[in-house]
């Protein structure tokens, strides 16, 4: 399983939606349940966030590669989680 990093902001509505989709998909698809997402709140950890190339949140990195940046739909979140378990 590939490592996943999520850069987010606590008050970001798009970030909350992405997390909700992630939880829903884990309930709907048992193969996603073991996936762990390292969550990095960029305002609390600017030193880490500054090491990555992105502008908008939420931003997902899978295995060190940026795979999604900005708002996300549920079907996009499912595709992202599938990349993790490939």
PLM features: residue spans?
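Thiol-based oxidoreductase modules, predominantly thioredoxin-like and allied folds used
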Residues: 32-46
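Local sequence-structure signature of Cys/Sec-based thiol-disulfide redox active-site neighborhoods
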Residues: 1-28
């Amino acid at each position: 399983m590939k490592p996943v990093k999520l850069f987010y902001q606590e008050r970001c509505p798009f970030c909350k939606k992405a997390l909700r989709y992630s939880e829903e998909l884990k309930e709907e698809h048992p193969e996603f349940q073991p996936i762990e997402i390292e969550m990095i709140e960029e305002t609390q950890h600017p030193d880490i966030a500054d090491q990555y190339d992105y502008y908008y949140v939420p931003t997902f990195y899978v295995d060190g590669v940026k795979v999604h940046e900005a708002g996300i739909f549920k079907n996009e979140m499912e595709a992202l989680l599938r990349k993790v378990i490939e």
